């Protein structure tokens, strides 16, 4: 899906700002009362003073009367949503015009043509934040009958982050040609000497056109190639490299009877990805991933788009010598992906497939029992849709170097292989760049119990030795994690290993002479132990800390106003360990052939 840009043939109007708002039922044929308002884009939760409203589950409404811009007879009007979490129904003047399920990918709805001559239209958005065993993420949904006979809806999350909800990303009103560019796919093949590239363009239009013209510009806006065919050869190319991004721009124009119908510009980078011999190669050089699992999570905004925080986070990431992040545990905003492209940051791109086990307590149970997860889950349709929409959205981003099919599912239980095999294949069939696919493995899915890692290209592990296992005992933890990593390497000698989560909750300012858990001293010792092990595993090609910053969670005995595993506090202030990471990561090259340095 194309990002909403202003071009010669397209107008975009930002509908963000203050909207009328209501939790609960509403008839869209009536006006929504204006006694309560809400911001778009943002999460509604943390703007609520009332705890009951903050934790509300069910339908909630946004409504606004907007001016109708001029629309010519050969144009159409579209409402384009960056995301609505988790379900949405869109009404224009009380009439349902579109709906979408899935809270982290964009969608659009056409405004009926009969409304184009109206002076104003009323846009109503019915959003819903219910999660159950058919949705991604997964939640345990229940209904409680209150004393007054009313029904209270409740979701017990199968995941360890707060169920923020709302119109989280930009809402645009677009005026575009009826005959328009629907999608653009760009692929490339680099020459043996990496000095030139063959480009292929697939331009999809919603109507037949006579001609497609493609012009490619470099970063100085100099024309470097043009074609009326689907192919183009570029010489003396600049590669997209780690923290040294180079973006070309493809201007696509479509014509009928020599008349311009639509124009759109898509950025792209030239780079090559390969997984081979236990290494992850970018432009034929081995990469070492240094970075983080993150969350879209800030004060007041919740999960709503915060572009200032995005930029601050990537500035802090680069300052530490890091080069990557994972979009844990859902697709991040299009704005963040475009920023990563521009800054040369590697992205491991994840669908919202989190909570794929019986319940959250089951995820903490390290015993080998089978909880019957794959007989319980009804998420297949939602999972397929999430993969399709993510690949459609992110396929051209050079920053995206790997797809994630799920985070910490019950991959050790019977039925896991049958569930994931077609989903991994779906990724590979859909992705025009044929990126590697991985699954982020849960702690109890050890090499002898896991049933799915044979399906994926890279072994990604979330491991908490010294925290959830051998809590506070770093001596035993070091023995345990080294033993398991060597077992994974022996089982899959040709697959690289990335630690996608490791960490320890740490309260800023809490100290101890004896380095006990939750102190800043223990966090430093925890990571020192972990890195000592990582450095001795030849196939281990990356370390992504859990987490970049502290973040909000649902209520549980393990959480004191959120998860505190961040290297930074929630307001992005560094903990003591940040300087230790900076020392380490500044000495590890981004391109690092580890097999040459590990004996």
Swiss-Prot record:
Domain of life: Bacteria
Recorded GO MF terms: beta-galactosidase activity; beta-glucuronidase activity; carbohydrate binding
Motif extent (N-K motif): 563-565
EC identifiers of the protein: 3.2.1.31
Known regulation of activity: Inhibited by a set of synthetic compounds like thio-urea derivatives and analogs. Inhibitors of gut microbial beta-glucuronidases are expected to block the reactivation of glucuronidated cancer drugs, and to alleviate drug-induced GI toxicity.
Active site positions, chain numbering: 408 (proton donor), 501 (nucleophile)
Binding-site residues, D-glucuronate: 160, 407, 462, 468, 501, 546, 565
Catalytic activity: a beta-D-glucuronoside + H2O = D-glucuronate + an alcohol
Pfam families: Glyco_hydro_2, Glyco_hydro_2_C, Glyco_hydro_2_N
Transmembrane segments: none
Family according to the record: Belongs to the glycosyl hydrolase 2 family.
Family annotation (PANTHER family): BETA-GLUCURONIDASE
Protein name stated in the entry: Beta-glucuronidase
């Amino acid at each position: 899906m194309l990002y909403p840009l202003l071009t010669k043939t397209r107008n975009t109007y930002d509908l963000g700002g203050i909207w009328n708002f209501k939790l609960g039922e509403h008839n869209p044929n009536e006006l929504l009362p204006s006694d309560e308002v809400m911001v778009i884009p943002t999460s509604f939760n943390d703007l609520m003073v009332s705890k009951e409203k903050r934790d509300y589950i069910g339908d909630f409404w946004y409504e606004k009367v907007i001016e109708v811009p001029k629309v010519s007879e050969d144009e159409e009007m579209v409402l384009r949503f960056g995301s609505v979490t988790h379900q949405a129904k869109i009404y224009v003047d009380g009439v349902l015009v579109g709906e979408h399920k899935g809270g982290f990918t964009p969608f659009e709805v056409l405004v009926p043509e009969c409304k184009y001559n109206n002076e104003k239209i009323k846009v109503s958005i019915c959003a819903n934040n219910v999660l159950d065993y058919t949705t991604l993420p997964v939640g345990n949904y229940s209904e409680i009958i209150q004393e007054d006979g009313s029904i209270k809806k409740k979701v017990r999350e199968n995941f360890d982050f707060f169920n923020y909800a709302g119109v989280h990303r930009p809402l645009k009103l677009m005026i575009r040609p009826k005959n328009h560019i629907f999608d653009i796919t760009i692929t490339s093949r680099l020459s043996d000497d990496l000095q030139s590239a063959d480009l292929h363009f697939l331009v999809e239009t919603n109507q037949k056109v006579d001609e497609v013209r493609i012009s490619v510009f470099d970063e100085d806006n100099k024309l470097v190639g043009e074609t009326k065919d689907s192919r183009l050869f570029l010489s003396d190319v600049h590669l997209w490299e780690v923290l040294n991004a180079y973006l070309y721009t493809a201007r696509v124009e479509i014509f009928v009877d020599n008349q311009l119908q639509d124009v759109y510009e898509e950025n792209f980078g030239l780079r090559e990805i390969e997984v081979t011999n236990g290494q992850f190669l970018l432009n034929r050089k081995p990469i070492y991933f240094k970075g983080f699992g993150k969350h879209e999570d800030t004060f007041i905004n919740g999960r709503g788009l915060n572009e200032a925080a995005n930029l601050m986070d990537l500035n802090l990431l680069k300052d530490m010598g890091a080069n990557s992040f994972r979009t844990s545990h859902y697709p991040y905003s299009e704005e963040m992906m475009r920023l990563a492209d521009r800054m040369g940051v590697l992205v491991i791109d994840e669908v919202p497939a989190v909570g794929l086990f019986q319940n959250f307590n089951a995820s903490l149970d390290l015993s080998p029992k089978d909880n019957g997860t794959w007989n319980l889950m009804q998420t297949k349709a939602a999972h397929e849709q999430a993969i399709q929409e993510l690949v459609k959205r992110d396929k051209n981003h050079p920053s995206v170097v790997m797809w994630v099919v799920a985070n910490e599912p019950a991959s050790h239980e019977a039925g896991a292989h049958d569930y994931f095999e077609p989903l991994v294949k779906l990724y590979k069939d859909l992705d025009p760049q044929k990126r590697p696919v991985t699954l982020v493995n849960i702690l109890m899915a050890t090499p002898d119990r896991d049933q799915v890692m044979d399906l994926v290209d890279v072994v990604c592990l979330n491991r908490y030795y010294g925290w959830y296992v051998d809590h506070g005992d770093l001596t035993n933890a070091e023995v345990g994690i080294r033993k398991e990593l060597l077992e994974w390497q022996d089982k899959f000698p040709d697959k690289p290993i990335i630690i996608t989560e490791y960490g320890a909750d740490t309260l800023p300012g809490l100290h101890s002479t004896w380095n006990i858990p939750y102190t800043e001293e223990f966090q430093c010792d925890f990571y020192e132990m972990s890195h000592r092990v990582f450095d001795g595993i030849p196939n281990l090609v990356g370390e992504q800390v859990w987490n970049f910053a502290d973040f909000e969670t649902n209520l549980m005995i393990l959480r004191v106003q959120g998860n505190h595993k961040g290297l930074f506090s929630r307001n992005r202030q560094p903990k003591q360990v940040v300087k230790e990471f900076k020392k380490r990561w500044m000495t590890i090259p981004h391109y690092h052939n580890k097999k040459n340095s590990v004996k």
